[in-house]
Amino acid sequence: RYSSRRMSCTDNLAIFWEKGFGNDLAAPPDLEGHPMAVDLENLKYQLERFYLFYRDSLKFVKPGSQSEKYRMMSMIQYSLEGTAYGGDYDQVIGAFWATPNRLQDKRLNAVAHELGHSFQLQSIADGEGVAWGGNGIFEMGAQWMLWQVNPHWIDDETYHWDAFKKNTHKAFLHTENIYRSPYILEYWSERQGLPFIGELFRQGKKGEDPVMTYKRMQNLSQEQFNDEMFDAYQHLINFDYKRVFSI
């Protein structure tokens, strides 16, 4: 299915593609009349750019991570399913899987999101943190990571913003908003620094949800947390975030 003969590497990632593509990702056979070509050079460029930002600026992995020993892996599937998902291989190294129709936009938003999951799971593979709080914080976190490397994410996926505006009454981490609302994470990172979100993931404990972890890390009472959330949403009314105004 996969082979080192159908592989291309950056400094930090190995990209494999399935046998159906043949040896050249730029000129594979169509599948059921659908073109399957992938711009490998753009994929390599963007993957390495995302990787370096997640590692060096967001600090989602710490020194000694297994990602220093192994390349993360990108697996391209010869399929029309339209799937993309991030995780890890054997609880050792981060990886993600995608089909060509998720790799067509030049900014590769789906790749940025799924590589975010690869880094989230890399922390766990490295023995830091647990998969706590359900999938909500993982999806919200991956959207926030995407937004860091593509400041035009809201313009690219305006449907998320439009849907969120109709659902602002729903609780933080409500499952209907997890792809739409990385704004609390933006607020926290603005107050505590970009690496704080990665540390939040590492600090998670069984029996906690992300709010409990955050309150413990910041030594906040429930009343203090409520006041902070109110302040966060006051900022959101005018999109009053330093990074957003700098774009």
Residue ranges of model-derived segments:
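N-terminal low-structure segments adjacent to metalloprotease catalytic domains
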Residues: R1-T10
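Juxtacatalytic substrate-recognition/specificity segment
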Residues: D11-G134, F138-A142, H152-D155
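Residue-level recognition of short, structured coil/turn motifs
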Residues: K59, I124, N150-I154, G193, ...
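An acidic- and aromatic-residue-enriched active-site/binding cleft used to recognize and process polar
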Residues: S79, S123-A125, W147, A163-K166, ...
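Generic structural signal for hydrophobic core residues of well-folded globular domains
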Residues: F119, M145, V149, W188-Q192, ...
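Post-HExxH zinc-binding segment in Zn-dependent metallohydrolases
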Residues: A131-T175, P182, Y187
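Contiguous mid-protein beta-loop-alpha structural module that forms a pocket-lining wall or clamp
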Residues: N177-I178, P182-P210, Q224, F230
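Beta/coil-rich, acidic/histidine-enriched accessory regions frequently appended to metallopeptidases
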Residues: E208-I247
